[in-house]
């Protein structure tokens, strides 16, 4: 297990040795708290877009199901007759310049895996730039969205936001509730109280402190042919290689177990690069990966490589709440 993986596991398990890092944690907390205070007071300037901006992010390190939720928000807004644009940091992407408009036929190395996935799945206009406010301005210069979704960027206060949605893994929660580097929190836990909504990935039902949502497997997609097959393509007990380079690989492996398959787990670092050689495992078995990994592997995929398509399914209460927020932010919006 790589050092980063061991550290992540320690954060969520609450390893006692992390107490040694608390002096650094105290310094980190002061820095991030002061940064936020500067923007809230107006001491540091934020850019406010002429259309509503909805930030979808988290305060923890590690995967929370953010990309599937963004896909759900895009499609939900479209069903309401709204045009949606997306901005993202584009973690790991190496575009020729910033800001960069992502197109569906660009390589993942240039566009970033998550932005490319979003564009390939939905076709929305999407701009990547570490400076999210600059990304929004570039998006508005080329398109006319009714609203903009900011993929992550919870801590990017240079971009003013009209709505904040925070996602949390319901199983791992906030770990030991410590800030970096003594724990997995990017901001103190009290920050959750300032968000407009908290969504718990994998919660059985809505909670007093937030809404629930789950990730529902929908199909197997062949990387080479694009063929879409039902989940009964593989019988119960099927052994297969499982590849996940996401923030929480175990969640993906657990999903495969829940489908009654027998995955041989191959966890990789989030946003990891791949090659045919790296993914040539023994014994020869079908290979199933996440959709996020698939956007990087299509150029060299084998015939028996598949990705598991998953869809976010939020609670009915969240859907109703979100529609109310759209009414507030866009009072003259079209009705379906």
Curated annotation (Swiss-Prot):
The keyword Kinase applies. Keywords: ATP-binding, Kinase, Lipid A biosynthesis, Lipid biosynthesis, Lipid metabolism, Nucleotide-binding, Transferase. Its EC number is 2.7.1.130. It holds the Pfam family LpxK. It catalyses: a lipid A disaccharide + ATP = a lipid IVA + ADP + H(+). InterPro entries: LpxK, P-loop_NTPase. GO terms for biological process: lipid A biosynthetic process; lipopolysaccharide core region biosynthetic process. Pathway: Glycolipid biosynthesis; lipid IV(A) biosynthesis; lipid IV(A) from (3R)-3-hydroxytetradecanoyl-[acyl-carrier-protein] and UDP-N-acetyl-alpha-D-glucosamine: step 6/6. One of its GO terms (cellular component) is plasma membrane. One of its GO terms (molecular function) is tetraacyldisaccharide 4'-kinase activity. ATP binds at residues 60-67. The keyword Cytoplasm does not apply. Belongs to the LpxK family. PANTHER family: TETRAACYLDISACCHARIDE 4'-KINASE, TETRAACYLDISACCHARIDE 4'-KINASE, MITOCHONDRIAL-RELATED. Transfers the gamma-phosphate of ATP to the 4'-position of a tetraacyldisaccharide 1-phosphate intermediate (termed DS-1-P) to form tetraacyldisaccharide 1,4'-bis-phosphate (lipid IVA). This is Tetraacyldisaccharide 4'-kinase.
């Amino acid at each position: 297990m790589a050092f980063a993986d061991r550290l992540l596991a320690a954060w969520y398990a609450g390893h006692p040795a992390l107490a040694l890092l608390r002096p650094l944690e105290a310094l980190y907390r002061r820095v991030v708290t002061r940064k936020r205070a500067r923007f809230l007071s107006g001491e540091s300037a934020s850019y406010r877009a002429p259309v509503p901006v909805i930030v979808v992010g988290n305060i923890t390190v590690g995967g929370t199901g953010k990309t599937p939720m963004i896909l759900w928000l895009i499609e939900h807004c479209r069903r309401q007759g709204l045009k949606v644009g997306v901005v993202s940091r584009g973690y790991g992407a190496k575009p020729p310049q910033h800001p960069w408009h992502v197109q569906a036929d660009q390589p993942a190395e240039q566009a970033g895996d998550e932005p490319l996935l979003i564009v390939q799945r939905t076709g929305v206009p999407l701009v990547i730039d570490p400076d999210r406010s600059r990304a929004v301005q570039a998006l508005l210069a080329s398109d006319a969205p009714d609203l903009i979704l900011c993929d992550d960027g919870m801590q990017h206060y240079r971009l003013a936001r009209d709505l904040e949605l925070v996602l949390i893994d319901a199983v791992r929660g906030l770990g030991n509730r410590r800030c970096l580097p003594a724990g997995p929190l990017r901001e103190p836990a009290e920050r959750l109280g300032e968000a407009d909504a908290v969504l718990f990935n994998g919660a059985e039902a809505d909670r007093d402190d937030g809404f629930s949502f789950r990730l529902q497997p929908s199909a197997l997609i062949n990387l080479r042919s694009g063929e879409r097959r039902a989940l009964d393509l593989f019988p119960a007990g099927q052994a297969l290689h499982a590849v996940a380079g996401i923030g929480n690989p175990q969640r993906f492996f657990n999903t495969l177990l829940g489908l009654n398959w027998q995955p041989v787990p191959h966890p990789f670092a989030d946003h990891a690069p791949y090659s045919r050689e790296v993914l040539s495992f023994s014994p020869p078995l079908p290979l199933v990966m996440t959709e996020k990994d698939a956007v990087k592997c299509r150029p060299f995929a084998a015939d028996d490589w598949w990705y598991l398509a998953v869809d976010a399914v939020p609670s009915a209460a969240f859907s109703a709440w979100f529609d109310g927020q759209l009414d507030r932010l866009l009072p003259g919006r079209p009705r379906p």
